[in-house]
């Protein structure tokens, strides 16, 4: 069966858009038996009129049990006596009072509930209870929420990449230093103590400068590589 929307579209796009066709538009509207309902994900699903009977069956209420039969009048009475009391608190009070009743006091309400269940079975012989699960929205703070696996993985990859980058920079720097130190003149053991002390002092000063330069270079390279990556995490 062609839906009303597609029929209207075909009518407006046709060349013979005459007054006679315009008169048939209300008939198309009446003959359309499609019921469109909005689903939970904001999309629309179409059901025929025959399938909509199942939704009526789902809306049938359950037969009342003994507690519901007893609490109807009690809830109304308690709400009138305590107008500021919340419904949840009233339910707690009614549950406590129901537990305090004896079996003899509960028995008339069990009999009434059995009668209501028998009437319900006669009226709805194919009834089956289908509980509707309600999504529980738990509001938690950001600190208690679990970390996103993708962000954790990106963080671990970033740390590993930074370690490998620093290791490569360290190896390259040490190789250049070894190459430079290999061209230094050998120490003359036969020289005077003053010359050996002067050479030792200059070598120590050179090593300190090289160490400071290496640390500065590595730190700068590390943070330059770290900051752009953090912007995508």
Curated annotation (Swiss-Prot):
It is found in: Nucleus speckle; Cytoplasm; Nucleus. This is Sex-determining region Y protein. It comes from Pongo pygmaeus. Gene3D superfamilies: High mobility group box domain (1.10.30.10). The keyword Transcription applies. The gene is SRY. The keyword Calcium does not apply. Transcriptional regulator that controls a genetic switch in male development. It is necessary and sufficient for initiating male sex determination by directing the development of supporting cell precursors (pre-Sertoli cells) as Sertoli rather than granulosa cells. Involved in different aspects of gene regulation including promoter activation or repression. Binds to the DNA consensus sequence 5'-[AT]AACAA[AT]-3'. SRY HMG box recognizes DNA by partial intercalation in the minor groove and promotes DNA bending. Also involved in pre-mRNA splicing. One of its GO terms (molecular function) is RNA polymerase II cis-regulatory region sequence-specific DNA binding. Interacts with CALM, EP300, HDAC3, KPNB1, ZNF208 isoform KRAB-O, PARP1, SLC9A3R2 and WT1. The interaction with EP300 modulates its DNA-binding activity. The interaction with KPNB1 is sensitive to dissociation by Ran in the GTP-bound form. Interaction with PARP1 impaired its DNA-binding activity. SMART domains: HMG.
């Amino acid at each position: 069966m062609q839906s009303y929307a597609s029929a209207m579209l075909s009518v407006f796009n046709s060349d013979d858009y005459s007054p006679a066709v315009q008169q048939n538009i209300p008939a198309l509207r009446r003959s359309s038996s499609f019921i469109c309902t909005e689903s939970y994900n904001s999309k629309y699903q179409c059901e025929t009129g025959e399938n909509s009977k199942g939704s009526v069956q789902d809306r049938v209420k359950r037969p009342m049990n003994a507690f519901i039969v007893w609490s109807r009048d009690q809830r109304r009475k308690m709400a009138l006596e305590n107008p500021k009391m919340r419904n949840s608190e009233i339910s707690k009070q009614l549950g406590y009072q129901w537990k305090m009743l004896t079996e003899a006091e509960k028995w008339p309400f069990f009999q009434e509930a059995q009668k209501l269940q028998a009437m319900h079975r006669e009226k709805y012989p194919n009834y089956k209870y289908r509980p509707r699960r309600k999504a529980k929205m738990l509001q938690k703070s950001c600190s208690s929420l679990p970390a996103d696996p993708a962000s954790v993985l990106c963080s671990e990859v970033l740390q590993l990449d930074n370690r490998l980058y620093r290791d490569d920079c360290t190896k390259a720097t040490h190789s250049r230093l070894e190459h430079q130190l290999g061209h230094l003149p050998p120490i003359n053991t036969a020289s005077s103590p003053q010359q050996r002390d002067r050479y030792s002092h200059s070598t120590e000063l050179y090593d300190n400068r090289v160490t400071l330069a290496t640390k500065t270079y590595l730190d700068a390279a590390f943070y330059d590589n770290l900051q752009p990556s953090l912007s995508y995490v």
